[in-house]
């Protein structure tokens, strides 16, 4: 099983970049859970994956243990970011996703920066884990390294993104 590193980061200074396409992009601070699930599960082959994600998301949202934001372009979801583990003092970001055709345009960075800054302004420590390839993305948004952990990818199971 291959070994890989996950880098744990914490928001040091909020740095939300400007909206990259203000004419056509709109921020949605409470997208419908089914729509978020459709977006996150597109291309997923496991028939139970949609149900599992949706059920967990609905439960966390209902309990105040998660918050998900999205960006829409001409009404359609094109990017999401979420704090999928919320406590009174900490928010763990995960599942930052932008449609592949729109990556590299600053949409995901804008959304993640806004969500992180908002959570921090409400008194939460904002943290996340990412692979080495994503470090520069998060550093530009004001995140700083906290520590690194080693993980094993089990044969036959997909690695975490």
Where do the language-model regions lie?
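Acyl-donor (CoA/ACP) binding surface of acyl/acetyltransferases
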Residues: 76-90, 123, 144-161
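Helix-loop element at the rim of GNAT/NAT acetyltransferase active sites that forms part
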Residues: 38-52
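Conserved GNAT acetyl-CoA-binding A-motif
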Residues: 119-131
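Acyl-donor-binding surface of acyltransferase catalytic domains
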Residues: 1-24, 149-157
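Conserved acetyl-CoA-binding loop-helix of GNAT-fold acetyltransferases
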Residues: 94, 98-100, 104-121, 140
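A conserved beta-strand-loop-helix scaffold within acyl/acetyltransferase catalytic domains
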Residues: 49-97
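A short beta-loop-alpha structural element at the N-terminal edge
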Residues: 22-38
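Conserved active-site alpha-helix within GNAT-family acetyltransferase domains
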Residues: 1-2, 109, 132-149
